[in-house]
């Protein structure tokens, strides 16, 4: 599947404003990998307090964006359509650079394990092809 717009994303993910952190999907191989994007704007509510004079996207929200991208890849499988993805854990999270208003986050997630309704995805977030964050995300599908 390629080039999913926001209408397509809303049919796959259960997340809605203000927690929907995916704007576009470039490509997805169901159950295997995905490349998605989040456009970061100054209008994001979290910038009011993080930080008022130097807005920086919270690292936990970058991880959440990676998790949502990975969820699209898994929820695109027929057996998981319409289900809810839940965080089960995070390993090896690293934050390398700040993400600020005007940035476009490129979210790449590859499933490294998928057994039954649980799995692990390796996520890498980039801005201008430079790694800004990475993590292994464990999840369960309910």
From Swiss-Prot:
BP GO annotations: fatty acid biosynthetic process; lipid A biosynthetic process
Subcellular location as annotated: Cytoplasm
EC number(s) stated in the UniProt entry for this protein: 4.2.1.59
Active-site residues, as the UniProt record annotates them: 50
Disulphide bridges: none
Signal peptide extent: none
Catalytic activity: a (3R)-hydroxyacyl-[ACP] = a (2E)-enoyl-[ACP] + H2O
Keyword terms of this UniProt record: Cytoplasm, Lipid A biosynthesis, Lipid biosynthesis, Lipid metabolism, Lyase
Principal localisation: cytoplasm
GO MF: (3R)-hydroxyacyl-[acyl-carrier-protein] dehydratase activity
Top EC group: lyase
Keyword field contains Cytoplasm: yes
Keyword Methyltransferase: no
Short name of any one Pfam family annotated for the protein: FabA
Function as written in the Swiss-Prot or TrEMBL entry: Involved in unsaturated fatty acids biosynthesis. Catalyzes the dehydration of short chain beta-hydroxyacyl-ACPs and long chain saturated and unsaturated beta-hydroxyacyl-ACPs.
This protein's name: 3-hydroxyacyl-[acyl-carrier-protein] dehydratase FabZ
Gene: fabZ
């Amino acid at each position: 599947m390629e080039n999913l717009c926001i209408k397509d994303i809303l049919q796959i993910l259960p997340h809605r404003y203000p927690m929907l952190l995916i704007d576009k999907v470039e490509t997805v191989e169901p159950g295997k990998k995905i490349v998605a994007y989040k456009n970061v704007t100054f209008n994001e509510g979290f910038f009011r307090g993080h930080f008022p004079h130097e807005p920086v996207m919270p690292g936990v929200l970058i991880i959440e964006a990676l998790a949502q991208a990975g969820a699209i890849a898994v929820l695109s499988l027929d057996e998981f359509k319409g289900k809810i993805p839940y965080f089960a854990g995070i390993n090896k999270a690293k934050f390398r650079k700040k993400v600020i208003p005007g940035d476009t986050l490129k979210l790449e997630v590859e499933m490294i394990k998928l057994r039954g309704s649980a799995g692990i995805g390796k996520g890498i977030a980039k801005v201008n092809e430079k790694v800004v964050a990475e993590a292994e995300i464990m999840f369960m599908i309910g």
